[in-house]
Amino acid sequence: MFGEGVGGDAAFTVEVESGVLGVIVDVLGHGEEANKLAVRMQEYLLRQTSGDVVGLLSRLHEGFRSSRGAAVGLCMIELASGRMRYAGVGNTVIRRFGDSETRLVSRDGVVGGTMRTPVEETLQLSDGDMVVLYTDGVKTHFVAAEYPWLRTHSPCVVATNIVHRFGKPHDDASCLVMRYKR
C-alpha cells in the first residue's frame, strides 16, 4: 500500500489437533496501530490447538472487544479426510480452485466490534485442490482463467502473484494459499 511502511493484515497457518488452520486477518485502518493489533491477534491464534473455527472466532471476538476490530477468516483442513471447515467475519474471502471453483461466504461484522454468531461452512477437498484466502485488498472477482497456472505453481508463488496481479494499490492486501495433498 502506498504511504505506509506496515499494514494491518496477517496471513498464516497453525498446526492444530487434526490438521492445519489457515488464518487471514484484516484489521480496520492502516499503519502502525493496525499492525500492532494484527500481531496481537496472530500471537493469540498461534497459541491455539483447536480446529473449531466457530469457537475460535467467538473467543477471538471476546478477547479483542476493546480493540479497533478486524475482519477474520479461519479455514481448518483435516489432513486425513480432506474435510475443510470455514468461518469468517467481515471482508475476507475464501475460494477453492480444483475441478470446480467454490466461494464460501463470510458473515457481516467486525471481530472485536459488532459480530453476529459465526456460521461454519464445510467442503470436501480433492487431491491437488488449492484453497485461497485473501483480504479485501485483493480484487474479489478474479477468475482462474486470469491466472492459468493457479493449480500448478507452488502455494507461495500463487499467493505472491495474486497480490501482485489483483491487489488494490491503496489498501493492505494479503493472501494465503494452501494446496491439499492426500
Kindly label every feature range from the protein language model.
Residues M1-A34, A38-R182:
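Conserved subregion of the PPM/PP2C metallophosphatase catalytic domain
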